[in-house]
UniProtKB/Swiss-Prot annotation:
Annotated family: Belongs to the universal ribosomal protein uL1 family.
GO cellular component term of the entry, any: large ribosomal subunit
Quaternary data: Part of the 50S ribosomal subunit.
Protein's UniProt name: Large ribosomal subunit protein uL1
């Protein structure tokens, strides 16, 4: 893959063979951002897990202390009373059968879907289109709930979902390049601490094999786990 001039210049700003402290890595990620827009900063964890085993297929949600800097569009599938609560909390759209039909016809101008438990059976028919897009509500991530207003508020305030991919990696946004370095660092630590908390008991050996930070289109910066809190 041919890299642009800006990317190649950015790579010269750090040593690829070195794993940096958490804060150093954040500052280098900001410095090496090559995008012309306010790029997203992402952390990637390579975990020693086998996602084919139920207890090692990690999935959940976490509220980042400083949000992600992204405006999140939330839709809520619920009956009229709950739909009203969701709209008051800032949902883009909320409804039941009509909204399900609209989505079934190909409308996907939203980022997260929340649903009340009583609507999940009707939503099931959209599983084939929602599943591959990662939009199907799930109790593990707090997107199947009766408290739709709280769910909408938390998601819009910076609650993110995480899950292991096919090879056991977890990728998560921690904010924008324009964020203060300390805030990005604290967001990264929130995700790290969560992953440590949910380490499966069946994992043998090193749990977190590699940690890297990068920005949209920018190079990856290695983070030393023992110094991630520094």
């Amino acid at each position: 893959m041919k890299r642009g001039k800006k990317y190649l210049e950015a790579v010269k700003l750090y040593d690829k063979s070195v794993a940096y402290t958490g804060l150093e890595a954040v500052e280098l990620a900001k410095k090496t951002s090559v995008a012309k827009f306010d790029a997203t900063v992402e952390v990637a964890f390579r975990l020693n897990v086998d996602p084919r085993k139920a207890d090692q297929n990690l999935r959940g949600a976490i509220s980042l202390p400083h949000g992600t800097g992204k405006t999140v569009r939330v839709v809520v599938i619920a009956k009229p009373e709950k739909a009203k609560e969701a709209l008051a909390a800032g949902a883009l759209e909320a409804g039941d059968v009509e909204l399900i039909d609209k989505i079934g016809k190909g409308w996907f101008d939203f980022d997260v879907m929340v649903a009340t438990p009583d609507m999940m059976a009707q939503l099931g028919k959209l599983g084939r289109v929602l599943g591959p897009k990662g939009l199907m509500p799930n109790p593990k991530t707090g997107t199947v709930t009766l408290d739709v207003a709280k769910a909408v508020e938390e998601i819009k305030a910076g609650k993110i979902e995480y899950r292991t991919d096919k090879v056991g990696n977890i990728h998560a946004p921690i904010g924008k390049v324009s964020f203060d370095s300390n805030k990005l660092h604290e967001n990264m630590l929130a995700i790290y601490n969560q992953l440590v908390r949910i380490k499966p008991a069946t994992v043998k050996g090193t749990y977190i094999k590699k940690i890297a930070l990068s920005t949209t289109m920018g190079p990856g910066i290695m983070v030393e786990e023992n110094n991630i809190k520094k």
